[in-house]
Swiss-Prot record:
Part of the high-affinity ATP-driven potassium transport (or Kdp) system, which catalyzes the hydrolysis of ATP coupled with the electrogenic transport of potassium into the cytoplasm. This subunit is responsible for energy coupling to the transport system and for the release of the potassium ions to the cytoplasm. SUPFAM superfamilies: Calcium ATPase, transduction domain A (SSF81653), Calcium ATPase, transmembrane domain M (SSF81665), HAD-like (SSF56784). The chain crosses the membrane at residues 31-51, 62-82, 213-233, 243-263, 573-593, 599-619, 644-664. It comes from the Archaea. Gene3D superfamilies: Calcium-transporting ATPase, cytoplasmic domain N (3.40.1110.10), Calcium-transporting ATPase, cytoplasmic transduction domain A (2.70.150.10), HAD superfamily/HAD-like (3.40.50.1000). GO terms for molecular function: ATP binding; ATP hydrolysis activity; magnesium ion binding; P-type potassium transmembrane transporter activity. InterPro entries: ATPase_P-typ_cyto_dom_N, ATPase_P-typ_P_site, ATPase_P-typ_TM_dom_sf, ATPase_P-typ_transduc_dom_A_sf, HAD-like_sf, HAD_sf, P-type_ATPase_bsu_IA, P_typ_ATPase. NCBIfam families: ATPase_P-type (TIGR01494), kdpB (TIGR01497). This is Potassium-transporting ATPase ATP-binding subunit. Its EC number is 7.2.2.6. The keyword Transport applies.
């Protein structure tokens, strides 16, 4: 353990020294100018006569203090960035540890051939047995079983995988046997892409960060011109301004605090999202999350728990309970979804015994988001289950009893699945899915931030209305198809609103790509994960709300520290200007702290300028405390804390530092 700590400290120190190189700091104009000032100060100390500055014992000690403090300013800035980069490196290192080279059982021409996982190819058919490592990313094409994904998602509970589900390489099958089709080549797996994304995301600046850097550069240039003007004006009045004093003035006035912490804030944003087991493809995605105006939520899995189960069968008039249970089982025999399996289990409990032999000659009709039904058919028999609207349109059939029953189930928040047998309604299956605990409070927090909520669901109008009212949703879209999500994204963006959404299917890909924040589920399709700009390793749709909170917090952190840094400059101005121009008695009016020793006063300001960076590093890395509220309330609160606080804090701190230096007999 001690050795690990040594390696961590050594690694952070190496990153810190690398970040102090001029070519690296060139991308941060504020800190680059600070480092140039450090080199100039060293040069002045070595060759004072060249610059015509006083070099008595007092001034010599002062120059040393300036050099040390400027070095520490650059060092503390670099170490804050190194700490953030160190966390990102730890994330990529942990992902690399998950990559496992194992033996894979490949099915070729009817035979099973063992090959190493790094020799596999896309579309290879692979057999995985109980307790074996999944050799590569793939899609389940046969069998079912529980897969331990804890090394990727952190979830300790194994996840059930059925036909059509995706599995991730380096996870472990803990039960049964699976046959999968490889969906990636070695080097292009999910984990490989995650490593690439994390490494890439730490290097890119976001648009807001670029804009802020330009603003800080302009501010720095203005203060550089002002400082140079002071040097010229002092010559005009027959005075020689001390260049080291002017350097201290420049460093104290330019926004060194936010300049020092800005890179760390950007990298910390990626790290904070990673702590939620979410991989962001870029800092832009996180930044967009902070500006979201509309959030599109799926009902199942986001508003509700997402595990709909069959709870009751309702036979139509003239059909017995056992007869309808048998029809429900037939319609779900080949349906390997969790809902289909629950229907089959309930039918078995009610005495319906169906085997594969009973269904010889039948063809499976798979469910699709377009048709909204599934079942089986033979030349002489058809059993189909699905949405009421879809079945009525397909079979041109109506039944008042069935329609009333579906409405009653929907009004209590359930999902009604009618079953049609040879063109006539045979009965209704009731599925129930509970609203997630605490979701109403979370939706309320979202609305407090002036964010509009839209729920999309494949359920009918009555169920959608009931669920949206229970959860406090602003707008709902019932009988939703994938194209509806895309249309909502387009509609909201045309209204100049920024949109966030969740998706997991290939049909969600267009909407995910169009949304400003698209969060794909890890258990979703490859197309969805490629279209989205964030991927949730835990496949928890509710995390979209966490992403928005994080985005807001990161933007507020950057804004708060910028406000604090600029407010600091106002205070330091009233400390340093009277100290530099102590020979002009008229300027004593602005010496509101009554600092009588100009050199100690300037040193005190520079000490504060340096140590405030250290105190703000935890805030930059951890983020400013954020409470969901309106923009006006948030602005008012931050101006009070970081604006007024940014003016008052330096006055108090500099005065205390000055008094301590005088008390210790420091007079240079």
């Amino acid at each position: 353990m001690n050795q690990n700590i040594i390696y961590t400290v050594y690694g952070d120190l190496k990153l810190t020294l690398k970040n102090m190189r001029p070519d690296v700091l060139l991308h941060n104009p504020v800190m680059f100018l600070t480092e140039v000032s450090l080199f100039v100060s060293i040069f002045i100390y070595i060759f004072p006569s060249f610059f015509g500055v006083p070099y008595t014992g007092t001034y010599r000690s002062f120059y040393v203090a300036v050099v040390v403090l400027l070095f520490l300013t650059v060092f503390f800035s670099s170490i804050s960035t190194a700490l953030s980069e160190g966390k990102s490196k730890a994330i990529t290192d942990s992902l690399k540890k998950f990559k496992t080279d194992v033996i894979a059982h490949v099915q070729k021409d009817g035979n099973i051939v063992d090959v190493r996982s790094n020799e596999l190819k896309k579309n290879d058919i692979i057999i995985i047995y109980k307790d074996e490592i999944v050799p590569i990313d793939g899609e389940v094409i046969e069998g079912s079983g529980y897969v331990d994904e804890s090394n990727v998602t952190g979830e300790s509970r194994a996840v059930m995988k059925v036909i059509g589900d995706t599995v991730t390489g380096s996870t472990r099958l803990v039960t049964d046997k699976l046959k999968i089709r490889a969906t990636a080549d070695p080097g292009s797996t999910f984990i490989d892409k995650m490593i690439e994304l994390v490494e890439k995301s730490t290097r890119e600046k976001t648009p807001n960060e670029i804009s802020l850097t330009v603003f800080l550069s302009g501010l720095t240039l203005i203060f550089l011109v002002i400082t140079a003007s002071i040097f010229a004006i002092s010559h005009y009045f027959g005075r020689t301004a001390n260049i080291v004093m002017l350097i201290v003035l420049l460093i104290a006035l330019i926004p060194t605090t936010i300049g020092a912490l800005l890179p760390a804030i950007g990298i910390a944003a990626i790290n904070k999202v990673s702590e939620y087991n979410i991989i962001a493809k870029s800092g832009r995605a996180i930044e967009n999350a902070g500006d979201i105006d509309t959030i599109i939520l799926d009902k199942t899995g986001t508003i509700t728990i997402g595990e709909r189960k069959a709870v009751k069968f309702y036979p139509n008039k003239g059909i017995s309970d056992v007869e309808f249970a048998k029809l429900a089982a037939m319609s779900s025999y080949y349906d390997q979804t969790k809902e289909g399996l629950s229907i089959f289990e309930l039918a078995k409990k009610q005495g319906a015994e169906i085997s594969k032999d009973d269904l010889k000659g039948y063809e499976f009709i798979p469910f699709s988001s377009e048709t909204k039904f599934s079942g089986i058919q033979s030349p002489s028999d058809t059993v189909i289950k699905g949405s009421l609207k879809a079945l009525k349109e397909k079979f041109q059939v109506a039944d008042e009893f069935i329609e009333a029953l579906c409405k009653e189930i929907s009004m209590r928040g359930g999902t009604a699945i009618p079953v049609v047998h040879n063109g006539k309604f045979a009965g209704v299956i009731e599925l129930q899915d509970l609203i997630k605990p605490g979701i109403k409070e979370r939706i309320s927090e979202i609305k407090n931030m002036d964010i509009k909520t839209v729920m999309c669901t494949g359920d009918d109008e009555v169920t959608a209305q009931y669920i949206s009212a229970q959860a406090g949703i602003d707008e709902y879209i019932a009988n939703s198809k994938p194209v509806d999500k895309y249309n909502v994204v387009i509609r909201e963006k045309e209204g100049q609103r920024m949109v966030a959404m969740v998706g997991d299917g290939t049909n969600d890909a267009p909407a995910l790509a169009k949304a400003d924040v698209g969060l794909a589920m890890n258990n979703g399709t490859q197309a969805a994960k490629e279209a989205a700009n964030m991927i949730d390793l835990d496949s928890n749709p509710t995390k979209l709300m966490d992403v928005i909170f994080l985005g807001k917090q990161i933007l507020i952190t950057r804004g708060s520290l910028t406000t604090f840094s600029i407010a600091n400059d106002i205070s330091k101005y009233f400390v340093i200007i009277p100290a530099i121009f102590y020979m002009f008695p008229s300027l004593s009016l602005v010496n509101i702290l009554d600092l009588t020793d100009p050199i100690v006063a300037v040193t005190s300001a520079l000490i504060f300028n340096t140590i405030i960076i250290v105190f703000l590093i935890p805030l930059a890395l951890g983020g400013v405390h954020y409470k969901p509220t309106s923009i006006s309330e948030m602005l008012k609160r931050n101006l009070m804390i970081y604006g007024i606080g940014g003016v008052i804090t330096p006055f108090i701190a500099i005065k205390l530092i000055y008094m301590l230096l005088i008390a210790w007999g420091v007079t240079w």
